[in-house]
């Protein structure tokens, strides 16, 4: 299923092999020739952020997407706009669709590695942004955000949405487990390692 808005945004509802569905979105710039693709990384999500469309559909993680399923979203959308032979190009990726990338780190890493590979899709590190609510899990005995600085080495966007702990917990229950103050040192390490600015995501409620 494909939906188009007046501003040129294109939303795809994609069916996977197991008949599950995920969404992918192409967001155009003003010229309508350059697109940012918004990728999903899982079917469902248990984080239950109040403002998230996924949380309105499912408050549980059904399954993570494989690296191939993540990359296939890019290839399908490239085919749709004929990225390969026309002036229209998907120039940027944001992993901000369905699911939390930091809860599917192994598969996200493989997908990003293939995206950056010179024999693959050839996206530079500053053309890819990974979003995180700030899941403070451990990966290979270090904090996941610190691990991602080395293994992903792309832009990081922190899904903050409120700097008031009580309010953030109300709209993002994960804040009860991984507080703002506990995540700031990890985010500083990410910047120190990558020298890439960290984006702050903030929804107007």
Residue ranges with predicted function:
Residues 6, 43, 61, 69, ...:
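Solvent-exposed, flexible loop/coil residues
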Residues 29-72, 76:
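Canonical Radical SAM [4Fe-4S] cluster-binding loop centered on the CxxxCxxC motif
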Residues 22-24, 34-35, 49, 103, ...:
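Short acidic, gly/pro-rich beta-turn/loop elements at beta-sheet edges
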Residues 16, 43-45, 160-162:
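Short, small-residue-rich loop/turn micro-motifs
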Residues 1-35, 39, 47:
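Flexible, acidic/Gly-rich N-terminal and inter-domain linker regions that tether
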Residues 79-205:
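Conserved AdoMet/S-adenosylmethionine-binding subsite of the radical SAM
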Residues 5, 40-41, 131, 159:
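Short linear Ser/Thr-Pro motifs
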């Amino acid at each position: 299923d494909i939906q188009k808005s007046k501003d040129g945004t294109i939303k795809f509802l994609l069916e996977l092999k197991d008949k599950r569905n995920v969404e992918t979105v192409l967001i155009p710039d003003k010229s309508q020739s350059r697109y940012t693709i918004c990728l999903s990384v899982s079917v469902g999500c248990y984080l239950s952020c109040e403002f998230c469309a996924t949380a309105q559909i499912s408050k549980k993680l059904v399954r993570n997407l494989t690296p191939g399923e993540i990359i296939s979203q890019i290839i399908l959308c490239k085919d749709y706009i004929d990225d390969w032979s026309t002036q229209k190009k998907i120039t940027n990726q944001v992993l901000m669709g369905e699911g939390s990338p930091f809860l599917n780190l192994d598969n996200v890493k493989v997908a990003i590695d293939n995206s950056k590979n010179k024999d693959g899709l050839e996206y530079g590190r500053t053309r890819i942004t990974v979003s995180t609510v700030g899941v403070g899990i451990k990966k290979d005995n270090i904090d996941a955000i610190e691990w991602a600085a080395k293994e992903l080495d792309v832009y990081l966007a922190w899904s903050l949405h409120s700097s008031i702990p009580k309010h953030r917990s109300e709209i993002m229950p994960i804040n009860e487990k991984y507080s703002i103050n506990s995540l700031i040192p990890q985010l500083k390490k990410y910047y120190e390692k990558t020298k890439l600015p960290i984006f702050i995501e903030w929804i107007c409620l």
